[in-house]
Amino acid sequence: MDSQGKKVVVCDNGTGFVKCGYAGSNFPEHIFPALVGRPVIRSTAKVGNIEIKDLMVGDEASELRSMLEVNYPMENGIVRNWDDMKHLWDYTFGPEKLNIDTRDCKILLTEPPMNPTKNREKIVEVMFETYQFSGVYVAIQAVLTLYAQGLLTGVVVDSGDGVTHICPVYEGFSLPHLTRRLDIAGRDITRYLIKLLLLRGYAFNHSADFETVRMIKEKLCYVGYNIEQEQKLALETTVLVESYTLPDGRVIKVGGERFEAPEALFQPHLINVEGVGVAELLFNTIQAADIDTRAEFYKHIVLSGGSTMYPGLPSRLERELKQLYLERVLKGDVEKLSKFKIRIEDPPRRKHMVFLGGAVLADIMKDKDNFWMTRQEYQEKGTRVLEKLGVTVR
């Protein structure tokens, strides 16, 4: 709470999950899937102890997803369906979750780097007009990640459910001209894993079994350090084979798919996406930065988001960066490689890093009136109020 007794809410709206809670807390109060579902047919009124309503949101929608037509209001970090997004926010602020009177609260929201201004304007409009928050702030996710890590300068590799961003931040300011995005993230890896399991002969349905396969992915997938070696092991031995019990009791065996699915992050052509993978993109981003800042960036690479949680990802990233640096900068001169310092930080709680950074920032700023856009300012200026964030509004 701030000095006037107003609650300060932090809401990190991801493509796949909403993480929400209060300023100063060190963990989100609620984490739930960012989905909205509508029943395909109205046959039963209840399943187990969940009542089927015309509109199901979050956890309930996730549990009954096989009976619903499911929509994700956000795609690749950007809101695509505003009506459904409002349902999601109603659920977040309503009795099911935070249970707050929005008129007496301030809210800190997060957005991906390179977010279209229109998207941000609309978010602010909804927050003030529909929910009547007393103050609103919109922070860039990569900057929050660095705050949570206690840094002001670094490169954030943020890979969530819908989009992967590589975002250099210098002295607390994100550098949009250097920010790169890769439209491969958790959801695409899950889809690819479904495809690989289908090739193995297991019948998975792309929508009904999506959650099941996501769980398999989270439990068993990893990033291979040396891909040729992993493929050899997969072909010639059974050391990689793990059993997994599905919710209905069937047991499946998963082998080479464990590293083949996340490999798409490093080799996008595997899932028919053009462009370079995450390691090369990171290398290109740092090399495009000012020569004086490059060394700082190489020493402060911070991973963030659920799709960076694969075992083996940090070491593979480091290996590829060193390889690229050796080939392209040192032109193969191995002697000089020992001077090349690189550090990849993989904090254990990186799944919720953006929320944690937001909770820290909102707590520090809760009583600083010139930080927040206020309802009064919005009534006077409309969306021009965003100029307070240092955003030019045409």
From Swiss-Prot:
CDD domains on file: ASKHA_NBD_Arp2
Amino acids binding ATP: 160-162, 214-218, 305-310
MF annotations from Gene Ontology: actin binding; ATP binding
Purpose: ATP-binding component of the Arp2/3 complex, a multiprotein complex that mediates actin polymerization upon stimulation by nucleation-promoting factor (NPF). The Arp2/3 complex mediates the formation of branched actin networks in the cytoplasm, providing the force for cell motility. Seems to contact the pointed end of the daughter actin filament. In addition to its role in the cytoplasmic cytoskeleton, the Arp2/3 complex also promotes actin polymerization in the nucleus, thereby regulating gene transcription and repair of damaged DNA.
Protein name as it appears in the record: Actin-related protein 2-A
Record flagged with keyword Chaperone: no
Pfam families, alphabetized: Actin
